[in-house]
């Protein structure tokens, strides 16, 4: 299937079929795909927690507002985290890069604009991996839902990944055949191509 057709088919699934589980092999493939996600100057300021343990998943579901039901119905929840400590990030992630990338890009164009800018830039890299991940799920025939509607403070406490702050989560599974949000029931709503694409 072409990428355009996949883009038309994928959607933020609201109701999953709890009888259809994704396999261990698919989970391992998704882990490898995320590890290969691109990032600015290959900075990789992230961690991805794959939650399959039913007890932990249920605790997280209870901290996920309107997303609770969806999390309870799938066997995989992936939590995307960003590194918290800028100094540690520079030492661990940037010191191994070609020096010119750090002195020619990171220092003058990111760091020079202040700590808030560095943090926002680091988070942007994690969001980029989300787009990559959602496309990979579609390619693998899996349904997925990105979720910012989660209690970040409680997620951090439950997952206890030292030095990493959760940003959002993604459920992965198979949609219920009657899901009201399926594009067959709820056509995709987007601005017109001419409103979002400029051709010069
Ligand atoms: C970063 C991000 C956070 C989102 N958070 C939620 C969420 O918490 N719950 C939910 O049901 N959908 C969530 N969505 C799904 C969007 O509402 C959905 O992608 C958008 O309405 C477009 O619909 P489509 O993905 O089905 O084409 C989120 C999407 C993104 C990209």
Enumerate the language-model features and the residues they cover.
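N-terminal targeting/leader regions
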Residues: 1-20, 26, 33
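C-terminal helix-cap and adjacent tail motif
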Residues: 5-7, 11-15, 167-200
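Short beta->alpha linker loops
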Residues: 22, 55, 150-151
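Small-aliphatic-rich amphipathic alpha-helix that forms the alpha element of a beta-alpha
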Residues: 34-36, 78, 100-101, 106-158, ...
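Glycine-rich phosphate/pyrophosphate-binding beta-alpha loops
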Residues: 38-42
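Short secondary-structure junction motifs
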Residues: 43-46, 142, 167
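Glycine/small-residue-rich phosphate/adenosyl-binding loop
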Residues: 49-124
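A glycine-rich helix N-cap at a beta->alpha junction
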Residues: 68-71, 77-80, 161-181
């Amino acid at each position: 299937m072409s990428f355009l057709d996949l883009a038309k088919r994928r959607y933020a699934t609201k109701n999953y079929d709890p009888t259809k589980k994704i396999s261990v092999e698919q989970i391992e493939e998704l882990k490898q795909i995320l590890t290969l996600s691109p990032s600015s100057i290959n900075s990789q300021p992230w961690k991805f927690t794959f939650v399959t343990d039913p007890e932990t998943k249920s605790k997280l579901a209870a901290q996920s507002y309107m997303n609770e039901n969806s999390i309870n119905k799938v066997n995989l929840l992936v939590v995307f985290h960003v590194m918290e400590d800028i100094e540690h990030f520079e030492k661990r992630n940037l010191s191994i890069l070609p020096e010119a990338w750090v002195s020619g890009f990171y220092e003058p164009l990111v760091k020079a604009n202040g700590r808030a800018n560095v943090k926002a830039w680091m988070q942007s890299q994690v969001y980029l991996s989300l787009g990559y991940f959602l496309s990979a799920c579609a390619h693998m025939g899996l349904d997925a839902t990105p979720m910012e509607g989660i209690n970040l403070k409680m997620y951090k406490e439950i997952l206890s990944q030292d030095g990493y702050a959760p940003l959002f989560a993604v459920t992965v599974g198979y949609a219920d055949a009657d899901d009201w949000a399926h594009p067959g029931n709820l056509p995709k709503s987007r601005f017109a191509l001419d409103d979002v694409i400029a051709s010069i």
